[in-house]
Amino acid sequence: TSSIFGMVAVPGQSAYHATKFAVRGFTESLALEMADTNPNLQIHCVHPGHIGTNIAGTARMDDRVAKKVIEDGKKSIFTWKPPTSLEEMGHEFKQGGMHPSKAAKIILSGVKKNKRRIFIGLDARLLDLSQRLFPKHYHKTWILFVPFLLLFRDKKPLRSLD
């Protein structure tokens, strides 16, 4: 699994982006290398957008970094209410994302359709599109659609996976 942050980058996440871009490059290269070896072999790279998990709440960081993360969160366009603590940031992140059961359904659908890249969530698809249309200035376009994504995010679990 890569991330939408294997397609686009934001300040302050260089190490994270490096790993996610690496996963994307490795997966795409592997898919090309293996293309003629076995017609039944499928290779996919999953690029989730904002999925409601504990990733932000369980992240460990130095106190100085944590303070900067909270300060940066106050300027973020990805949240309605700026966090006052790491715990609050983790809670808001989990509550604000797509339910993991819906993400799983999208992944399975992408695998069934043999998609090489599987984008999870409208946010992931729009961030990817903004990068393709505006390669040097994509981050400046996010303010146009992120508020709508926050309003219409699908946070409900699938009934069969509750």
Give residue spans per PLM region.
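Residue(s) in the substrate-gating loop at a strand-loop-helix junction
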Residues: S3
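Active-site-adjacent segment of SDR/Rossmann-fold oxidoreductases
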Residues: V8, S29-L41
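Active-site loop immediately N-terminal to the catalytic Tyr-X3-Lys motif
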Residues: V8-A15
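Active-site helix of classical SDR
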Residues: T19
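Hydrophobic alpha-helix immediately C-terminal to the catalytic Tyr-X-X-X-Lys motif of short-chain
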Residues: A22, F26-M34, V46
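SDR active-site lid
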Residues: D36-L122
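A transmembrane-helix-recognition feature enriched in membrane-embedded lipid enzymes
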Residues: K115-L151
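Terminal low-complexity segments of carbohydrate-biosynthetic enzymes
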Residues: L150-D162
